[in-house]
Amino acid sequence: FICILNACGSIGSVDKGTRVHNAVISMGFLEDLVLGSALMDMYVKCSALEKAHKVLKELPVREVVSWNALIAGYVKQGQCHKALNCFERMQSEGLCPDVVTFVSILKACGTRGTIDNGKQIHRKILGRGLLGKGTMLGNALIDMYAKCGIFSEAEKVLKELSDRDVVSWNALIAGYAQQGQGNEVVNCVKLMQTEGLCPNTITFLCLLKVLGRTQAIDIGREVHNDIVDRGLLDKDIRVGNSLVYMYGKCGMLAKAQKVLEELPIRDVVSWNTLIAGYGQQEQCQEALDCFEQMQNEGLYPDVVTFICILKACGSTGAIDKGKQIHESIINKCLLRSDIVLGNALVNMYAKCGVLARARKVLEELPVRNVVSWNALLAGYAQHGHGPEALNCFEKMQNEGLIPNVVTLSCVLSACSRSGKLNEAQMLFTNMTTKYGINPTLEHYTCMVVVLGNVGCFDYVISAIEGMPSSDSLAVWLAVLTACRKCGNVKLGRLAFHQAMRLDGSCSTAYVLMANIFASANMQG
């Protein structure tokens, strides 16, 4: 039975493992401690953690090793609160955590950001004198503090480690990279090398990530040369993909594509990274070209590819391509399991102005969230369909979904573009009391537009005076646009001077002011 259970765990076959479990019960072997531990281990490996926990509770004797397996399983599945609960329960039974327990539970603390628990565990480790026994615990402590953003403590632990290694440094480097602190990452890499330690793949992955986020292209080029000299591009595809990411984030997409094309091996992630880079820089035709080239190489798009390429289709209005991709998604049955992909489809159709299709896709999604409705509402707003937007807004709330800042911006924008003054005023008035949302600059801008469009200029001034700050070029351009329609020279002059104060080279403000004079049959 033990051998069969090990095999079931190795291949992740929970169904076969459950059948073995039933056989164990029917033969009365459940009291056997070794067999019970094997059962629990099988369920953990199959990610059936509730079943594993049930087996553990039924064991005649529970040992630290059994608890460690369950705690590690919960941490791996991201159920860190359950891992912490198991940690407490284990100690309440009189069992003493070992190094393996502490490593897992520190990871849980770092993932959840529960720094108080982490500090408490740190004290227990110090009290038992465990830090001097290998690097595992020290590295886990550094990782926990770094993930919680407590870098002073992470550095202190690192400095106190007598036998720190590249993993120790990587834990600190990864934390700084996650926080976008590029200078600290670079400094850590230099300090690590002064200790005679060589950066490894993980070091470079963290380094390239933060250099991309901070657009530190000069250092990025140096790191690229170092990677080539070390021959890492031939050893790990992740390094090449991270280089593509770094150049893409820095806006050097031609270089990113050149790096990709020179990789000895490229995969779907390589192409997804480049396609996403082109999308972020609004070079959507290039993204579509990469999509075709990737498939010509025999690589199949995954969910991430489809999400990126649907965004490109929406931005370029490539509705035929978007429909073709939609068909591929349906054929692969991907909409059943991924709400982000469904939302991307709604967004693509909405941006292309095919609003009936966008709504149909939304209504057919197995699960809808606020983002789903926001995508449709943004489409209605973009095309000035106020009544439809208000209808969707009501239906969304009837489904029990709570509007967020983006939702209210979309509805206000739809009202402003379709002249729905009363509806806009009611929504704006209720934002704080009904929805608990303080109006943002974008919300005020929408109100300025809707009030200006119907000539309520006294209310426009009141709205601007109520804003947290009037230093918004978008607001004053909205006022100028409204004044152009109605020929309101007095308010137009005020808006023009405010726009010039914020941006003296704004050509749009000059054009709008000239049009205001023209519509009022006046000369400047």
What kind of region is each of these model predictions?
Residues 1-4, 17, 32, 36-37, ...:
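Pentatricopeptide repeat
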Residues 40-42, 59, 90, 144, ...:
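Methionine-biased hydrophobic packing positions in alpha-helices, especially
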